[in-house]
Amino acid sequence: ADNSVTFVLYDKDTKGQSHKYCYIVGDWNNWERVKEGSMFRDNSAGCWWIKLDGFDPTKEYRFQYRLGNESGADTFVSDPYTEIVYDQWNDKYISWVPEFPEAARQLVSAFQIQKPQYAWKHKDFKVQDKNDLVIYEMHFRDFSATKDIAGAMAQLDYIQNLGVTAVELMPI
């Protein structure tokens, strides 16, 4: 199995300017700006990129991009396309979420190369016409008092009464 990941971050403002450097920091390098995490610049695409090897495909890893210029403090950015976001302000109230990394700043992204397969319980389920869906974007933490799936499921009648035909779960 492949144990490598390619990270890419677009970094160009409305004036065409970008940061002078970008490092990837995460669980695997103790959230430190190290040479092996220095990302390459592709000026034509406006992106920073790096390919890293040696990840355990079954393990989840957390990371951030650390951008900066010669003067001033670094900016810490999560990946805008991540499926999982860890939040230092709210996650401390969720018992099953791992402790927020002490050296990280702001929001933290996560990835896992080999995600566990979901075992569907209803094999005969049919999705309605995708052009006729009424989608409700739901974040458990903000939707119910208990901030979990049980609290959300207890309010499915409310969602159905709104005319919603599909629920999109937002990242945790």
At which residue positions do the language-model features occur?
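Hydrophobic core residues within well-ordered beta-strands of beta-rich domains
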Residues: N3-V5, Y61, V134
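Aromatic-rich carbohydrate-binding modules that target alpha-glucans
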Residues: S4-T58, G68-N90
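Core domains of carbohydrate- and sulfate-ester-processing enzymes
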Residues: F63, L67-H122
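Non-catalytic, glycine-rich low-complexity segments
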Residues: A1-Q17, V97-A103, F125
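Aromatic-rich, solvent-exposed beta-strand/loop patch
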Residues: W120-H139
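Extracellular/periplasmic catalytic domains that process cell-envelope and extracellular macromolecules
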Residues: Q17, D56-P57, V127-N131, Q160-N161
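Aromatic- and glycine-enriched glycan-recognition loops and surfaces
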Residues: S44-T58, R141-I172
